[in-house]
Structure formats: C-alpha cells, structure tokens
Swiss-Prot record:
Chain ranges passing through the membrane: none
PANTHER family associated with the record: RIBONUCLEASE (PTHR10954:SF23), RIBONUCLEASE H2 SUBUNIT A (PTHR10954)
Protein name: Ribonuclease HIII
Subcellular location: Cytoplasm
SUPFAM superfamilies in UniProt: Ribonuclease H-like
Organism: Streptococcus uberis (strain ATCC BAA-854 / 0140J)
Pfam families: DUF3378 (PF11858), RNase_HII (PF01351)
Biological process, per Gene Ontology: DNA replication, removal of RNA primer; mismatch repair
CDD domains, per database record: RNase_HII_bacteria_HIII_like, RNAse_HIII_N
Recorded catalytic activity of this chain's protein: Endonucleolytic cleavage to 5'-phosphomonoester
Positions bound to a divalent metal cation: 88-89, 193
Cofactor info, note text: Manganese or magnesium. Binds 1 divalent metal ion per monomer in the absence of substrate. May bind a second metal ion after substrate binding.
InterPro entries: RNase_HII/HIII (IPR001352), RNase_HII/HIII_dom (IPR024567), RNase_HIII (IPR004641), RNase_HIII_N (IPR024568), RNaseH-like_sf (IPR012337), RNaseH_sf (IPR036397), TBP_dom_sf (IPR012295)
Length: 301
C-alpha cells in the first residue's frame, strides 16, 4: 500500500468534494474537512489544503482526480511537529512472557519533557532506565496499553487457530489505537512501527470488528524517528518486563527474555517440574523453543 500527499487549491477542494460526495465516510478528526473511500483508497482532505490518499491504487486515483503527486510517505522522512499517535509492541520475539502493545498520543508541547526524560528508541535503553521512566510517561502521556498474556496468546495464536503471529499484532495495534481515539485525542497522523507491509496489515484488518477512518502509516524503526512511538515502546517494554517478573515469581524460575538457548534450558526445567501446563501458562507454545525444550527434557530422562 502507498500513501500519496498533494497540496490542492481551494477551488480544487470544492471540485474534489463534489466528485467524491457519493463515497463520503464519517470521521472524527476536526483537522479533516472531508473524507471518502473511493476504489479501496482512503481520501482525507485536511483543512490546511493537504490531500492524503492511502491505498494500493493511491497513485492511480491521484491521476484520475487530476493531481500531480508531490511526495510518497514511504520515500520521505516524516516530521513530528504535530499531534500524532505512535504505536509499538514488545514481546513478539520472546518465548516467555506476553505480547504488549501500546498506542500513545504525543503533542509538540510534550517534546521537551520527553527529551529531558531521555526518551529514545527503547531498544537502546537499559531495562533499569525503562522501569524508571515508564511510570512517568504513563502519568503524563495519553496512551492505551494492552497485554496479551501467554495463556491467552496460546488460545488465539497457532496452527488452526484464529490468529497467526502477524495477524494477532494487527488486531492488538488496531484495538489499542481505536481505544485511544475514544479518549477524544485528535492526531494528524498515526504511525505504527512496521512489522509487516501496509497491504498485509490491511488484509488482516478486514476481520477486525472495531475500525477507524484515520489513515495509518507503517514505518520501519519508527521508535527512533518519532517520540510518540518511542513512548509506546518504553511503556510496552515495561509492561512486558512486569509480566515476565510476575510469571517468574509464580513459577519459581527466572524466565529469560528472548528466544535463545537459555529459554530452551529454562523451558526444559519447567517441563520436568510442572509439565506442559507450565509452558502453556508462561510461554508462546508455537515457538520452536517448545520442541527444543521437549528434546532437552527427554535427554535428561
């Protein structure tokens, strides 16, 4: 999927609205003067005169409407000097622990405060630093946090189940953003740290009940480019760590983050101590670590 942005004059705006009137859709963003869904392309006309076209046929529709495209969002570095929602997830690459997804709403006036806290790509911050600043961010920044526990994850994700490893993330990001928008925040753009293509995201999105009309943009390594995504990454990391701590305390074993050999070893110990039910409660069963742990446990017999 591509996103096209063009600047149009007032006369062109009126003509555009008349042409797309039969395809008009409702939207709650006061910055958007008109919204339509035309030939599977979302058309958002902002009061500033900016027209955003998003969909697989965005370039074709822009030409059909008589506009010369000025820029594609996948070829430019977007600024962040406007209100935006950023969304990120943590835990998808870890065998133990749940899957945390957070969407955050950040305004330009928040930037100085966030920089003073040292907000950056959470992957470059220590867990100790994340545990320190996450509560401050949760108090200051409007956000929505979702945690899919391993036990719930295993009922939803896997062969023959409702979701796969990608579609479950689409569902969680969509729900977090949807719920944050219910708090009456008004973003000019919604950025998701890319974990799949736009087209694949939209394909999985079709099955979700809760929908919103605001356009989304998936950008790789967005947490290092947008403070809103960095905030979400930090809050999500803290939520994941708290879940991992709680599971470790309940089971009496220190559960590692990640999906390396250490996870295999701890999983085999859990199998010996409690059986498969311990992994179903604390880990993502469809990971290859499960079979490796079973093999390790058998060698010890």
């Amino acid at each position: 999927m591509e996103t096209i942005v063009v600047k149009i004059e007032e006369g062109q705006q009126n003509a555009l609205q008349n042409k797309l009137k039969p395809y008009q859709i409702s939207q709650n963003n006061p910055h958007v003067a008109f919204a339509a869904r035309y030939k599977a392309v979302t058309c958002l006309l902002y009061r500033s005169g900016k027209l955003v076209l998003q969909g697989n046929l965005a370039s074709q529709i822009a030409q059909e409407l008589g506009f010369q495209t000025e820029e594609k969002t996948d070829k430019i570095k977007l600024g962040q000097n406007y209100p935006l929602i950023g969304s990120d997830e943590v835990g998808n690459g870890s065998y133990f622990g749940g899957l945390a997804v957070v969407a955050s709403f950040v305004k330009p006036e928040d930037h100085d405060y966030l920089k003073q806290l040292g907000v950056d790509d959470s992957k470059s911050l220590t867990d100790h630093k994340i545990r320190q600043i996450a509560p401050l961010l949760e108090e200051k920044i409007p956000h929505k946090s979702l945690l899919l526990t391993p036990q719930k994850y295993n009922t939803l994700v896997g062969k023959g189940k409702a979701y796969n490893a990608v579609s479950v993330k689409v569902a969680l990001h969509n729900q977090a953003i949807f719920l944050l928008l219910q708090q009456k925040v008004i973003p000019e753009r919604i950025i998701i740290d890319a974990f799949t293509s736009h087209s694949n995201y939209l394909k999985h999105l079709k099955t979700e009940k809760n929908q919103f009309t605001e356009a989304i943009t998936l950008i790789e390594k967005a947490e290092s480019q947008f403070l809103a995504v960095a905030v979400s990454s930090i809050i999500a990391r803290n939520l994941f760590l708290e879940n991992l701590d709680n599971l470790s305390n309940e089971l009496g074993y220190q559960l590692p983050s990640g999906a390396g050999s250490k996870s295999d070893q701890v999983a085999s110990q859990l199998l010996e101590a409690y059986g498969m039910k311990a992994l179903e409660y604390s880990a993502k069963i469809h990971f290859a670590n499960t079979q490796k742990a079973i093999a390790l446990a058998k060698r010890k017999d």
